[in-house]
Amino acid sequence: IVSALDRWLADAVQPAAQRWFGVPVAEIRQISAYSCRGMNGQPGARISEHAFGNALDIASFVLADGRKITVRDGWRGSPEEQGFLHDVQGAACEQFTTVLAPGSNRFHYDHIHVDLMRRASGNSVCNPDAVPGDVVAARVAKERGYAWRRGDPGVTGSIGKVSAVPKEKLKPSFKKKLKKFFAPEEDDDDWVEDDGPRPRDD
């Protein structure tokens, strides 16, 4: 799996990060690699590729400038986040024999699972179907638009930036919401190693 990951990182993840965010990926955070268990952590299920050290669950990408793109939030996040994540998921489908991302089932809502399972049929699994990031980002931008309503402080579709609206014009309650929205996430390195749903902190 290591050589497939290296190819995917070099050929797809880094170019996609440069394209969508203008900086490379500095770190990939995984939530499960080797784990001797059944598929999706379910008792009685077929043995998981994780049990063979042949799978990886990717939860987030940390960019060189410190921004963190989580699969859980970014899959339905800004056009840039969605475009990036769909591009890397689609490219993963070319490198791995199994790719499961949000929308595939309830166990993969917060990560992209990749493995090199060998099937007698020779078939691969790419679920949900790969859609180019450009297509996804254009659809999201069209649905959401980048214009804002009167009185809105003008949060743009890009992550981590707020347009130049004087702070004195913001209502106190909205200042609080913005502060919470842009607060750094808590470190999630303490996730347990399974594919089951994790409670959200919010």
Labelled PLM ranges:
Residues 19-53:
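Active-site-adjacent substructure of cysteine-protease-like catalytic cores
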